[in-house]
């Protein structure tokens, strides 16, 4: 296969520090062995490479706010996919149709702002929008297994004003729900439910013992360390139940199948020690 791609960058001679990027191309993805097996387990050697025509527009904007450095990165993209080999997802098992009988598209936007909201610490905010659908045998568009509409995340770092050796961070994540998948080899057009939205908050506290190493006398036991710190973290601090996939269970009486969510880890407490010589 031949996959021509190109990228162009433009940096105008403006007072503002902005870089524009344009990239695109035609990409082929040859099938692997698993993508050649149909629902009976038979290998279909005539499955073709899936292809994608994509276009990406981006910009990097560096600026100063409160006399501190910040950067805003933005990207918008569109992909048109042909000869798609559709697949279904059950729990962690991916089943391919072994047939290039679908077309698809993906479009989205990624935004990220990072900088020193607090002097000497890096924080960032990010937002993503994604829409990806596929059309199998001209039956109409349905959501692809990766169709997660919105993603929003914040990582904010700070330190205690009177004790700068004590650093804290807060990580917040909110994602809209993914498609819930479908039983193996079932018609995905029948199973178009979604998982619950993903919500998570993490917090961490770190005490850096080597913060004042430059002013310490020679021979002090901490002088031999470039970094020596210990901390305490709480992951998923509000104990949210976040599902990642469904396991499908059949009712023997009605013959219906029901999705049982597979949940990720709930609240976790973590102690950490970091040493660098």
Label the predicted regions.
Residues 78-80, 99-182:
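Gram-negative outer-membrane beta-barrel transporters
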Residues 1-17:
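Signature of Gram-negative outer-membrane beta-barrel scaffolds
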Residues 11-13, 21-23, 48-107, 230, ...:
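Membrane-embedded beta-barrel scaffold of Gram-negative outer-membrane proteins
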Residues 6-10, 57-61, 109-115, 125, ...:
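Residues on the lipid-exposed face of transmembrane beta-strands in outer-membrane beta-barrel proteins
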Residues 24-30, 63, 76-83, 129-133, ...:
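Transmembrane beta-strands of outer-membrane beta-barrel pores
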Residues 120-123, 174-183, 207-277:
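C-terminal beta-signal and adjacent terminal beta-strands/loops
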Residues 12-19, 64-70, 119-120, 160-166, ...:
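Short loop/turn motifs that connect adjacent beta-strands in outer-membrane beta-barrel proteins
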Residues 2, 51-55, 78, 103-107, ...:
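Residues that define the transmembrane beta-barrel architecture of outer-membrane proteins
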